[in-house]
């Protein structure tokens, strides 16, 4: 992510597009700290330094993923608004279009729920890593091997699986939700215009 997301509500298409432009689709991530972290090897020589880096890294990632989760909830709110809009349309001949939209909206909602579930699990993993990294910095030398092993395991989980997986899903879901939300109002306007034109004939 190139720019830190601000806390304002992103409801208009322009605000949403501005946010999406700040994302890196080539390498979706919640920060650039991962690149620096991978250069740190877990060994007794720099173990405490690694624990400190891991602690700082996870703290930053928690902030970024929290911002993403809020954006997903806002996207879901927009989706519900557009669902209500489509249900209220007075065009009787547009049942097929409405059915397609509602079906897509249902699929997007499932994706949003899935992303929130992954977000919850990722937070649990981050909290565990934070605890391990913090305790490692004050542990006795006889306990270092244990914390060192745990930190290495958590780093592997985050770098090879969890971070890249959830990042790609969040970006993909935001793209789908954005496209569906942007098309909903257009479909509604077209259907209403067609209905009014038919009444005049």
Curated annotation (Swiss-Prot):
Listed name of the protein: Twin horsetail protein 2
This protein's record includes keyword Transferase: no
Taxonomic path: Eukaryota, Fungi, Dikarya, Ascomycota, Taphrinomycotina
Gene name for this UniProt entry: tht2
Compartments, record wording: Nucleus
Keywords: Chromosome partition, Meiosis, Nucleus
Any single GO CC term annotated in Swiss-Prot or TrEMBL for this entry: nucleus
Biological function: Required for correct meiotic chromosome segregation and recombination.
Organism: Schizosaccharomyces pombe (strain 972 / ATCC 24843) (Fission yeast)
Record has Nucleus as a keyword: yes
Single GO biological process annotation from the record: karyogamy involved in conjugation with cellular fusion
């Amino acid at each position: 992510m190139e720019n830190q997301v601000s806390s304002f509500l992103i409801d208009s298409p322009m605000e949403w597009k501005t946010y999406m432009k700040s994302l890196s689709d080539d390498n979706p991530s919640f920060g650039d700290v991962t690149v620096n972290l991978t250069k740190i090897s877990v060994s007794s020589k720099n173990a405490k330094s690694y624990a400190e880096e891991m602690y700082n890294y996870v703290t930053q990632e928690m902030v970024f993923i929290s911002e993403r989760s809020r954006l997903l909830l806002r996207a879901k709110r927009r989706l519900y608004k557009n669902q209500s809009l489509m249900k209220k349309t007075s065009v009787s001949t547009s049942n097929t279009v409405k059915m397609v939209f509602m079906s897509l909206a249902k699929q997007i909602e499932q994706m949003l729920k899935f992303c929130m579930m992954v977000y919850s699990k990722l937070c649990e993993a981050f909290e565990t890593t934070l605890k391990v990294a913090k305790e490692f910095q004050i542990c006795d030398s006889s306990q270092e091997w244990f914390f060192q092993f745990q930190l290495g395991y958590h780093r592997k989980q985050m770098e090879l699986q969890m971070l890249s997986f959830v990042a790609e899903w969040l970006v993909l879901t935001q793209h789908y939700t954005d496209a569906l939300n942007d098309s909903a109002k257009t479909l509604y306007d077209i259907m209403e215009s067609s209905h009014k034109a038919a009444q005049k004939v």
